[in-house]
A protein has these predicted regions:
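Conserved beta-strand-loop-alpha-helix hinge in the C-terminal portion
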Residues: 1-10, 14
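Non-catalytic connector elements of ABC transporters
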Residues: 12-14, 18-111
Length: 111
């Protein structure tokens, strides 16, 4: 697995992390990894579920509709911007505070 492979199957969010004893901490949470040391953590936009919460830790920057789905750009408190993709069941607007739930990540050694 590599970042090249991850990018070839879509436009994932790639985060840097360092894993100790199979646990890697990133700016989007803590995850289990089969690798130790410096890692890239790939999170596909459709693996990030947003929920509107007035006390949320993230802020929606923009939402782009594609008919069958939508891509939501959101920012953490460090100013890093990430993308989520979901069905248009919930309408997100710039400035909405949200929380996230991540269903799946892929890790691989950093180049």
């Amino acid at each position: 697995q590599s970042q090249t492979v991850a990018n070839s199957v879509g436009d994932p969010n790639i985060l840097k992390g360092f894993s100790v004893d199979g646990v890697v901490e990133t700016s989007l949470g803590t995850f289990v990894s089969a690798y130790n040391g410096a890692l890239d953590v790939s999170i596909r936009p459709e693996c990030i579920e947003l929920s509107i919460d007035s006390e949320g830790s993230y802020v929606v920057q923009e939402c782009t509709f594609y008919g069958h789905d939508q891509v939501i750009s959101f920012q953490n408190s460090k100013g890093e911007v990430f993308r989520a993709r979901s069905l248009p069941n919930t309408i997100y607007e710039a400035g909405d505070k949200v929380n996230i739930k991540i269903s799946e990540v892929t890790t691989f050694p950093s180049n």
